[in-house]
Amino acid sequence: MFYKEIGFSNSDIATYSKLLNWWVTIVFSLLGGLVNIRYGIYRGLMIAGVAMAASNLLFALIAQTGPSTSLLAITVIVDGFTGAWSTVAMVAFISLLCNRAFSATQYALMASLSVAGRTLVASSSGFVVDSLEGNWSLFFILTAVMVIPSLCFLYSIRHHIKRVESP
């Protein structure tokens, strides 16, 4: 809906949002895994959270400037990168918290909870944009700001994560 309202063609959407994003997700999932191994789960989560918020600001820029395939390509690459990285970081974090004896059940519950917020927000985003009088730029800025409480909470539990992460 966003891409169409901004003025991108179906061909642009398919090329950049679908095809390019697929490759970016594969490549950066591997890179995200390497970064989490090298720097730890806490840093991986923190960097992913900040990067995801920043990627939403690129969507706000698209909403302000109008259709530009080069900006769309950059935005899709950055968004795919941050999405892949954050998924890897979240999977590592959830796996870290699971007890081996109950790992399947615990992982399923925590994974479901980790996407519940995103699903609820995504399903109501149209109503939010309508209440903002179609201001997609403001919507994406608000979604970037909404990350701040999660990052503050993550920062407050960093010592616990590092303690559990250390063998």
Task: Label every PLM stretch briefly.
Residues 1-15:
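Short amphipathic helix-loop junctions that connect adjacent transmembrane helices
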Residues 50-67:
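C-terminal ends and interior cores of transmembrane alpha-helices
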Residues 127-149:
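A membrane-interface helix-boundary motif in multi-pass transporters
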Residues 10-11, 100-110:
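Loop-to-transmembrane helix entry/capping segments in MFS-fold secondary transporters
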Residues 84-99:
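Intracellular juxtamembrane helix-capping segments at the cytosolic ends
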Residues 141-167:
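Multi-pass alpha-helical transporter architecture, strongest
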Residues 27-44, 129-130:
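Helix-to-loop junctions at the C-terminal end of transmembrane segments
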Residues 15-23, 50, 77, 108-116:
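Transmembrane alpha-helical cores of Major Facilitator Superfamily
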